[in-house]
């Protein structure tokens, strides 16, 4: 396992995940009967500040079809949590207009690169172009100075 599991923190994430799914109208309990399902949901809502008991609730009441998706969500959240601790692994976001993003995505796809790799490549290309332009300007000035002296 690459990332350490923190039971209290992850139980809080699980609680939030389940409450969000319930509010979106998804069935989060294993019960078909509405009253039993509502009773289990009310019990879950009461466990907001008791993270250890959330895991017990999950074992007893959660819809088994939701288990795999919840695990994937928690795994992704754990990864983001630990990556955010280090500057070099922290994800950044930038605002792009849709047309800009579309062109960038198309270029990345043609080059077979990720968006980040494509942006780095574009920056490097611009830097090389700038360096080349500076060298050409210097060369022109030197050439004019040589021709002007004669």
Curated annotation (Swiss-Prot):
Keywords: Cell cycle, Cell division, Cytoplasm, DNA-binding. It comes from the Bacteria. Homodimer. The lineage of its organism: Bacteria, Pseudomonadati, Pseudomonadota, Gammaproteobacteria, Enterobacterales. Required for spatial organization of the terminus region of the chromosome (Ter macrodomain) during the cell cycle. Prevents early segregation of duplicated Ter macrodomains during cell division. Binds specifically to matS, which is a 13 bp signature motif repeated within the Ter macrodomain. GO terms for cellular component: cytoplasm. One of its GO terms (biological process) is regulation of DNA-templated transcription. InterPro entries: Arc_rbn_hlx_hlx (IPR013321), MatP (IPR009390), MatP_C (IPR035375), MatP_N (IPR035087), MatP_N_sf (IPR038339). Belongs to the MatP family. It is found in: Cytoplasm. GO terms for molecular function: sequence-specific DNA binding. HAMAP family: MatP. This is Macrodomain Ter protein. It holds the Pfam family MatP.
């Amino acid at each position: 396992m690459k990332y350490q599991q923190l039971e209290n923190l992850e139980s809080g994430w699980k609680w939030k995940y389940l409450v969000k799914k319930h509010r979106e109208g998804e069935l989060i309990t294993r019960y078909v009967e509405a009253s039993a399902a509502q009773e289990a949901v009310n019990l879950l809502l009461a466990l907001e500040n008791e993270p250890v008991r959330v895991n017990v609730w999950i074992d007893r009441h959660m819809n088994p079809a939701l288990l795999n998706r919840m695990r994937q969500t928690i795994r992704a959240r754990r990864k983001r949590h630990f990556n955010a601790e280090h500057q070099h692994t922290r994800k950044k976001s930038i605002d792009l207009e849709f047309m800009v993003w579309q062109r960038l995505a198309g270029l990345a796809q043609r080059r077979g690169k990720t968006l980040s790799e494509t942006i780095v490549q574009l920056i490097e290309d611009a830097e090389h172009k700038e360096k080349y332009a500076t060298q050409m300007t210097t060369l022109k000035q030197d050439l004019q100075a040589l021709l002007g002296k004669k």
